[in-house]
């Protein structure tokens, strides 16, 4: 939705080359940080194309998709966006519990929270619901988010401001 209109190879890759259509309910963090530091992120997601009627395939696809945005509540608490220059991000572990079968080629609501985010680490938890509100899976992930310090942080802020201005111009 946001990235599809940006004429840049990375934006186009994120928008169209991945197999999932992801629509943010809460403001997307691609360019700008959230206006307020909060610990909640919500997206609707589904595959772009229909999948076969294999429950194992749908579980595998949901596991894959669950990693796309689970660090975003942690980014929100740190007050940064994905474009933050000099930021290092990594998933440290990822666990998933399946409660009921679900089709990932139909819209699923992924509600994510971060009960703890400090010291370059954070815990992201998520719940995946069908359109009728049925809970189908629960997710937990610990992530690392390192921001540059000192002079590197000052240089990164200048680069980040320039990049955000350029991307905002493209988005208009």
Q: How does the language model describe each region?
A:
Residues 1-172:
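Terminal targeting signals and extreme-terminal segments of soluble enzymes
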């Amino acid at each position: 939705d946001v990235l599809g209109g940006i004429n840049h190879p990375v934006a186009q890759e994120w928008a169209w080359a991945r197999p999932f259509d992801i629509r943010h309910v809460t403001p997307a963090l691609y360019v700008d940080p959230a206006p307020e530091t909060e610990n909640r992120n919500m997206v609707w997601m589904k595959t772009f194309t229909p999948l076969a009627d294999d429950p194992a395939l749908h579980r595998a696809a949901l596991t894959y998709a669950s990693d796309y945005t689970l660090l975003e509540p942690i980014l929100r608490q740190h007050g940064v966006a994905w474009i933050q220059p000099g930021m290092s991000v990594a998933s440290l572990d990822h666990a998933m519990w399946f409660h009921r079968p679900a089709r990932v080629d139909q819209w699923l609501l992924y509600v994510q929270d971060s009960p703890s985010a400090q010291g370059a680490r954070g815990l992201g938890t998520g719940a995946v619901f069908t359109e009728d509100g049925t809970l189908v899976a629960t997710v937990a992930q610990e992530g690392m988010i390192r921001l540059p310090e000192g002079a590197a942080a000052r240089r990164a802020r200048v680069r980040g401001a320039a990049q955000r201005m350029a991307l905002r111009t493209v988005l208009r």
